[in-house]
Amino acid sequence: MRSDTIKKGFEKAPHRSLLKATGCVSTRDDFSKPFIGICNSFNELIPGHAHLQELGRIAKEAVREAGGVPFEFNTIGVCDGIAMGHVGMRYSLASRELIADSVETVVEAHRLDGLVCIPNCDKITPGMMMGALRTNVPVVFVSGGPMKAGHTPSGKTVDLISVFEAVGKCSTGEITEDELQTVEECGCPGCGSCSGMFTANSMNCLCEALGFALPGNGTILAADPRRNELVKAAAGRIIDLVKKEVRPRQILTRTSMLNAFALDLAMGGSTNTILHTLAIASEAELDFDFSELNDLSAKTPYICKVSPATTEVHIEDVDRAGGISAILKELSKVEGLLDLSAPTVTGKTLGENIASAEVLDRTVIRSVEEPYSTTGGLAVLYGNLAPNGAVVKTGAVSPAMMKHTGPAKVYDCQDDAIAGIMNGDVKSGDVVVIRYEGPRGGPGMPEMLSPTSAIIGRGLGDSVALITDGRFSGGSRGACVGHVSPEAADRGPIAAVQTGDMITIDIPARSMTVALDDETIRQRIEALPKFEPKIKKGYLARYARMVTSANTGAVLKNDF
């Protein structure tokens, strides 16, 4: 075992003495057992993580019962909702790399034999997965589970996005401050990851398709007693994985990546999933090109529409309808779409995991013969405005905005854009351009939930598009095109756009262009002053110097 490095031989007496002092090693026999890290992300700032301390306790008990010695440690975490719309959002994506580094550091420094990862919200799941793949010790994931949707006294179903959009409605006088207060009180009724198919839930669902989590991981509610049972079962699997030396790079293969992307497309997951899955692939040293998503989308039906794409369905409804296993079972009817022989941490193949699944509600999970769309709910757009690609959540775009041409309204930061939208500068037909908010320019590629919610709240969702080298919350909806690559800070064409330039977004054609010739774009970019970083010290300054483009997952450079 790896852990023998710190526990075997007379020269390791000091190490054993310290391990005994932790209270986790209680008998001499414990030194012959696998040492398992319980990588928790409990903290009291994130509603999706406030309950994870109890799940950690359950996981430790399960590991002991299975014959291992558990050691719990924590990672940091950022609540994207609380960080939204201010400087804190610049730290959100950047926190993913800190989490990956933290996992690597603890596992390698203490020679752990295996990991049980307990994430829940946006950057924590991919960060832990990146760290696990880097160390390549056996691992199983079990998330904290989704939040239940809220309900107003009148019976209307609401969630966090309802609150953000209500701010825009309040600013126009469509609703009163008292009505806004009602939505605020009801939008987030308890612990768990926010209740729609936002980034956190998207990633936790993808864990099932990737093979790293047990069935139910993505959809069983945080407050459901079945969540505790799932934690116990998942943690109980790790000893078998350690003994059989089943490593994460054996689980994460190119075909399991394609399985996950197919699920993502079928349920219209967050655009952030593309960013994170590319980063995960990078850690596993798998080649996966941004453009392949469109080829996969062409044969993947969009069969499960969840908030924010609709206000009628939330994650709890997906669970009631059969969960992720039911979606995958339905997708397996499309010849050649899924590799059902892919291995998983259950010890069974993906096909065996979903064999008994069935769709229990066709209003939530449609058949592949009658999908919402014959193509997937995410797409990559190319053109002279995004030579290296940009991402849009097609499943959350209204039919009226699938093709749109309009004049650019350019803002060099998110704050200016929010002000412009809220004070009425943005008009019907405009294409809002928010730039210098990419991985390097932001820095940290902040999410644009506040401006997209303001557009929706002010009644412009069917007439205004928004493009950015930043990214979007999984809760954003509308004609929102993000991850524009190259970013403005790297002098991509988005840096050349001026207010009034005509921009065409053609989602069916996977195209996004600005009505400028190549020479004009070149001349405008050459005339720009040298890009000056917004933050010059601390972690974000270091991050900005090392981060790569969104089309490669915004991972950090490893070639110095």
Curated annotation (Swiss-Prot):
Cofactor binding notes: Binds 1 [2Fe-2S] cluster per subunit. This cluster acts as a Lewis acid cofactor.
Catalysed reaction equations from the record: (2R)-2,3-dihydroxy-3-methylbutanoate = 3-methyl-2-oxobutanoate + H2O; (2R,3R)-2,3-dihydroxy-3-methylpentanoate = (S)-3-methyl-2-oxopentanoate + H2O
Protein name: Dihydroxy-acid dehydratase
Species per Swiss-Prot/TrEMBL record: Chlorobaculum tepidum (strain ATCC 49652 / DSM 12025 / NBRC 103806 / TLS)
Post-translational modification N6-carboxylysine, affected residues: 123
Cofactor(s) required, per the database record: [2Fe-2S] cluster; Mg(2+)
Gene Ontology terms: cellular component: cytosol
Annotated catalytic residues: 473
